[in-house]
């Protein structure tokens, strides 16, 4: 069963409060999402492997540690997931970036893949799939399906806010993918919005309706 990690770092929780606030404008919203993504990336990369190397300081040669050849990839779910990418790349600039685009079929209400672009060495990379919201879980499940059928084997999912229903759906379909979130909210309402949530992340990020 996939593990769920809720980050309770004070800075993450502080910034998340203003992300939720209906009075937060588009520019500030984008900046806050970027900042929280950086803080979450710091937490999610705690287990990266290290190897010891020699480094020449101005005084003498010393033993020190560097990341041990780990290949990472960041995959935002379009469009709202794009707002989290730069925050992660600030910490791991060598990561390759893929994209997964999905839309909801008006008849079946199920997510449909319309765009996928991943690094060519997909089987060798560990991916962090990002989306600000995990509501019903439908889009996240389909995005992970897209990665796996193209050869991805090591995947983590990172979002700002999740509903219990979305977490359950993810664990049902992708029990091998751990979930990293800033807050686990109460529930979904009848329209599928997370309660209390933050509204529509994409609309608030890009100033659309």
UniProtKB/Swiss-Prot annotation:
Query: Could you provide one GO biological process annotation from this protein's UniProt record?
Result: UMP salvage
Give yes or no: UniProt keyword Glycosyltransferase: yes
- Alphabetically list the UniProt keywords: Allosteric enzyme, Glycosyltransferase, GTP-binding, Magnesium, Nucleotide-binding, Transferase
Describe activation and inhibition of this protein. Answer: Allosterically activated by GTP.
Q: Which residues bind uracil?
A: 194, 199-201
**Record-level Gene Ontology MF annotations:** GTP binding; magnesium ion binding; uracil phosphoribosyltransferase activity
Q: Which reaction does it catalyse?
A: UMP + diphosphate = 5-phospho-alpha-D-ribose 1-diphosphate + uracil
Q: Which CDD domains match?
A: PRTases_typeI
Q: Which cofactor does it need?
A: Mg(2+)
The free-text cofactor remark is:
Binds 1 Mg(2+) ion per subunit. The magnesium is bound as Mg-PRPP.
Q: In which pathway does it act?
A: Pyrimidine metabolism; UMP biosynthesis via salvage pathway; UMP from uracil: step 1/1
For whether the record's keyword set contains Repressor, the answer is: no
Binding-site positions, 5-phospho-alpha-D-ribose 1-diphosphate = 79, 104, 131-139, 200
The UniProt entry, under InterPro entries, shows: PRibTrfase_dom (IPR000836), PRTase-like (IPR029057), Upp_B (IPR034332), UPRTase/APRTase (IPR050054), Ura_phspho_trans (IPR005765)
Give the domain of life: Bacteria
Report the EC number(s), separated by commas if there are several.
2.4.2.9
Against NCBIfam families, the record matches this protein to: PRK00129.1 (NF001097), upp (TIGR01091)
Function recorded in the entry: Catalyzes the conversion of uracil and 5-phospho-alpha-D-ribose 1-diphosphate (PRPP) to UMP and diphosphate.
Q: Indicate the family of this protein.
A: Belongs to the UPRTase family.
Protein's name according to its UniProt entry: Uracil phosphoribosyltransferase
Gene that produces this protein: upp
């Amino acid at each position: 069963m996939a593990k769920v990690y809720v980050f309770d770092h004070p800075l993450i929780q502080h910034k998340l409060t203003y992300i939720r606030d209906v009075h937060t404008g588009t520019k500030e919203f984008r900046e806050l999402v970027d900042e929280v993504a950086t803080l979450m990336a710091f937490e999610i990369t705690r287990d990266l492997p290290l190897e010891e190397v020699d480094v020449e300081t101005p005084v003498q040669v010393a033993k020190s540690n560097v990341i041990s050849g780990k290949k990472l990839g960041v995959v935002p779910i379009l469009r709202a997931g794009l707002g989290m990418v730069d925050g992660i790349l600030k910490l791991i600039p060598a990561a390759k970036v893929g994209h997964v685009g999905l839309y909801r079929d008006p008849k079946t209400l199920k997510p449909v893949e319309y765009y996928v672009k991943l690094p060519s060495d997909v089987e060798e990379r560990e991916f962090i799939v990002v989306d600000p919201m995990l509501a019903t879980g439908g889009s996240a499940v389909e995005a992970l399906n897209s990665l796996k059928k193209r050869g991805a084997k090591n995947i983590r999912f990172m979002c700002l806010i999740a509903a219990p229903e979305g977490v359950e759906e993810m664990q049902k379909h992708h029990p091998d993918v751990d979930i990293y979130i800033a807050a686990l909210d109460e529930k979904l309402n009848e329209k599928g919005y997370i309660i209390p949530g933050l509204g529509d992340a994409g609309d608030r990020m890009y100033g659309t309706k």
